[in-house]
Amino acid sequence: MTIGLVGRKVGMTRIFTEDGVSIPVTVIEVEANRVTQVKSVETDGYNAIQVTTGAKKASRVTKPEAGHFAKAGVEAGRGLWEFRLNNGETFTVGSELKVDLLADVKLVDVTGTSKGKGFAGTVKRWNFRTQDMTHGNSLSHRVPGSIGQNQTPGRVFKGKKMAGHMGAERVTTQNLELVRVDAERNLLLIKGAVPGATNGNVIVKPAVKA
């Protein structure tokens, strides 16, 4: 199943098993995911559904967005996401996906936008080792060192790890244990940490490697 749910990262807490074992969990709030469009091979070249969730102020909704949501007959949400469909899966515009979609799932993949760290050096960004703090080393404690050769090849290879912007990129953490599905409060409790900051959007899917 490629269908997932779009939720909001509330934060972390812990729960206890009957044996008294403490399990750290991330709480994901999943408001109803409303289907705004159903794409098909005939019209779009592939099968997928487009969903929205949450709410957005009317003053923040553009006219094209307002028309799109009105055509689907659903309330404007805080964004649009897409999930590919397998052959045989059918959905209708206006239908809702809720947390019970994952009721029988044990492991999930969670996708989010990692916390931005700004401009970071190679030690923080790529885990480079530092050079000696003493023993004759001056001003080269955290420098990356050589970035290549001389005349041959006479250039720096693509992908060379250097200092630069760190974080604020799409990240997926795989095979996280789904500890609990709270259908009454629309919550997912996932063991461990998930990418992103508090209140960030996350996508929860059944694990592809489970």
Swiss-Prot record:
InterPro entries: Ribosomal_uL3, Ribosomal_uL3_bac/org-type, Ribosomal_uL3_CS, Transl_B-barrel_sf. GO terms for molecular function: rRNA binding; structural constituent of ribosome. The modification N5-methylglutamine is found at Q151. It comes from the Bacteria. GO terms for cellular component: cytosolic large ribosomal subunit. Belongs to the universal ribosomal protein uL3 family. Pfam families: Ribosomal_L3. Disulfide bonds: none annotated. This is Large ribosomal subunit protein uL3. PROSITE patterns: RIBOSOMAL_L3. One of its GO terms (biological process) is translation. Keywords: Methylation, Ribonucleoprotein, Ribosomal protein, RNA-binding, rRNA-binding. The gene is rplC. The keyword Cell membrane does not apply. HAMAP family: Ribosomal_uL3_B (MF_01325_B). One of the primary rRNA binding proteins, it binds directly near the 3'-end of the 23S rRNA, where it nucleates assembly of the 50S subunit. It comes from Aeromonas hydrophila subsp. hydrophila (strain ATCC 7966 / DSM 30187 / BCRC 13018 / CCUG 14551 / JCM 1027 / KCTC 2358 / NCIMB 9240 / NCTC 8049).
